[in-house]
Design a protein with these regions (language model features):
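The alpha-helix within a helix-turn-helix
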Residues: 167
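Short, Lys/Arg-rich, polar N-terminal cytosolic tail immediately upstream
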Residues: 1-6
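Membrane-water interface segments at the C-terminal ends of transmembrane alpha-helices
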Residues: 7-38, 54-131, 136-157, 185, ...
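Short glycine/proline-centered loop/turn elements that form peptide/ligand docking sites
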Residues: 159-163, 261-262
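Glycine/proline-centered hinge or cleavage motifs at structural transition points of membrane proteins
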Residues: 170-171, 184
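A short amphipathic helical element positioned immediately N-terminal to and/or at the very start
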Residues: 42-51
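Short cytosolic juxtamembrane segments of multi-pass membrane proteins
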Residues: 90, 256-267
């Protein structure tokens, strides 16, 4: 038995090698480039240049706003859809078809489905040239909505339905039960979906390029431009700023995710 455990321990070696080579080392390189100048010496020039540039601060602010707006829209649309899916009886083919319809676009290339969405909006009279922000937001919601529905659906399946019934037995109406019992119980799914949408939205550049016809510049577009121009230090610092923002967001939501039942209740 001891010999078997000894062998199993080494099965994780390829995993740790992969993490070191493709996660840790690239992250360390980004930090190094972000905190150094073109001569390779440690410097805060990138810090000063970024935070003294009003255009870049504006791009970061717009990216955060669009990320938050897209996250809110995805949750507002995805929550009732997830509720509808969980209320269907087991073995119902309709629920399987609906889940398949939400998952199928994820099987298609990201750029191709974004371009198809752009062409559909053209046909409806909404083009990125005249309505860049509207077209971009539609593209964002379309691409990231499944990432909200799936964790919400999973959380609602695990939710203790007896607590909902207890809320009604204690005299709560549907609105009170929804906001004071169901929402707290599904908060881990809401947070998971929000993080899965907010993080890629902030760093996205393909959707804004394709849907907005390059009339919208987000912080992801700035990072892409810097790396295309071989400006590794400036691009790495902006990427590091985004990593810090995302890390702060994850820390703020950590307690909510680890205590799903502690916040539920009628009062």
């Amino acid at each position: 038995m001891l010999k078997l455990r000894f062998k199993r321990k080494y099965l994780s070696i390829p995993y740790f090698i992969f993490l070191i080579c493709f996660v840790l080392l690239p992250l360390l390189l980004i930090i190094y480039y972000a905190l150094s100048n073109e001569n390779g010496t440690i410097s805060l020039d990138n810090f000063v240049e970024f935070f003294s540039n009003k255009n870049k601060i504006g791009l970061l602010s717009v990216s955060i706003i669009i990320g938050a707006l897209n996250t809110a829209l995805c949750i507002l649309i995805g929550y009732p859809v997830a509720m509808l899916l969980t209320k269907n009886k087991k073995g119902n083919n309709k629920i399987s078809i609906m889940i398949l319809l939400f998952i199928m676009p994820m099987w298609i290339n990201f750029v191709l489905r974004t371009a198809a969405t752009r062409d559909l909006l053209y046909w409806l009279g909404i083009n990125g040239g005249n309505y860049p922000y509207l077209a971009t937001m539609i593209g964002m919601v379309y691409n990231y909505l499944p990432f909200t529905i799936l964790p919400l659906y999973s959380q609602m399946l695990k939710m203790d339905k007896s607590l909902i019934e207890a809320s009604y037995d204690l005299g709560a109406n549907k609105v009170q039960t929804f906001f004071k019992t169901q929402i707290p119980l599904t908060m881990p799914g809401i947070i998971s979906g929000a993080m899965m949408v907010f993080m890629p939205t902030m760093s996205s550049f393909v959707i804004s390029d394709v849907m907005g016809e390059r009339k919208i510049q987000l912080i992801g577009n700035t990072i892409q431009f810097n790396f295309d121009q071989m400006r590794w230090h400036e691009g790495s610092f902006i990427a590091l700023v985004m990593l810090i923002i995302i890390g702060i967001s994850m820390l703020l939501t950590r307690n909510v995710k680890t205590e799903p039942n502690a916040r539920g209740g009628l009062w």
